[in-house]
From Swiss-Prot:
Transmembrane segments: none
Gene Ontology molecular function, alphabetical: DNA binding; zinc ion binding
UniProt record similarity statement: Belongs to the RecR family.
GO biological process, one term: DNA repair
Zn finger region (C4-type): 60-75
Role played: May play a role in DNA repair. It seems to be involved in an RecBC-independent recombinational process of DNA repair. It may act with RecF and RecO.
Annotated source species: Francisella tularensis subsp. tularensis (strain SCHU S4 / Schu 4)
Domain (Toprim) ranges: 83-177
Domain of life, per lineage: Bacteria
SMART domains in the record: TOPRIM (SM00493)
UniProt protein name: Recombination protein RecR
Family matches, as Pfam families: RecR_C, RecR_HhH, RecR_ZnF, Toprim_4
InterPro entries listed in its UniProt record: DNA_Rcmb_RecR (IPR000093), Rcmb_RecR (IPR023627), Rcmb_RecR_Znf (IPR015967), TOPRIM_dom (IPR006171), TOPRIM_RecR (IPR034137)
Length: 200
């Protein structure tokens, strides 16, 4: 509940902002008051860009990354190595890997991890699409770049079991602590993690 000093419309903005990751009560209040009082033009610009994006952004038919086109820039890039497939949890992981400049293959974005307690199973992660991609392409290595959490370990194990035995499966390792999230690793640690990946 927001404070009674706020009107219903201001409270609605505050509550909406609180739904964002890492935004707590105080931060949502500060953001709402800044946007409404100090920079209403910014609020309108943000609202318009979000409306436009939600109407036009979809998931790439291959890797499940967010894109405006049916196929994203990475999947449509013929200079990428089509024989390597890196499986990641989110687009934030893709950004981290791309910015580190350590990988030139293709991706598959799970958009989550298997977590039965949260109602997330293989179908929610589109693993049927992943299986089809692996079957259709001449992939010689699948790289599991999944965070070493309990859910991440479950997800990595499930995926490794569904991949054909003649395909090399590796897992990034060095420098990624248990419970750590890939997106928060610095580029040097990520480089070591990729170079020190182990076969499953």
């Amino acid at each position: 509940m927001t404070s009674k000093i706020f009107s219903p419309k201001i409270s609605a903005v505050i509550e909406s902002l609180r739904k964002l990751p890492t935004i707590g009560k105080k931060s949502s209040q500060r953001l709402a008051l800044y946007l409404l009082d100090k920079s209403p033009e910014t609020a309108i610009a943000i609202a318009n860009s979000l409306l436009d994006a939600t109407a036009n952004i979809k998931k790439c038919v291959y890797c499940q990354a967010l894109t405006e086109d049916d196929v994203c820039n990475i999947c449509s890039n013929t200079n990428r190595d089509n024989t390597k497939l890196c499986i990641i949890e989110s687009m934030l992981d893709m950004i981290a890997i791309e910015e580190a400049g350590i990988y030139r293959g293709k991706y598959f974005v799970l958009n989550g991890r298997i977590s039965p307690l949260d109602g997330i199973g293989p179908s929610e992660l589109k693993l049927d699409i992943l299986q089809q991609i692996i079957a259709d392409r001449k992939i010689d290595e699948v790289i599991l770049a999944i965070s070493p959490t309990v859910e991440g370990e479950t997800t990595a194990h499930f995926i490794s079991q569904m991949i054909a035995k003649d395909i090399k499966i590796s897992r990034i390792g060095f420098g990624v602590p248990f419970g750590g999230e890939l997106e928060y690793l610095d580029q040097q640690t990520l480089l070591h993690a990729f170079n020190a990946r182990t076969n499953i």
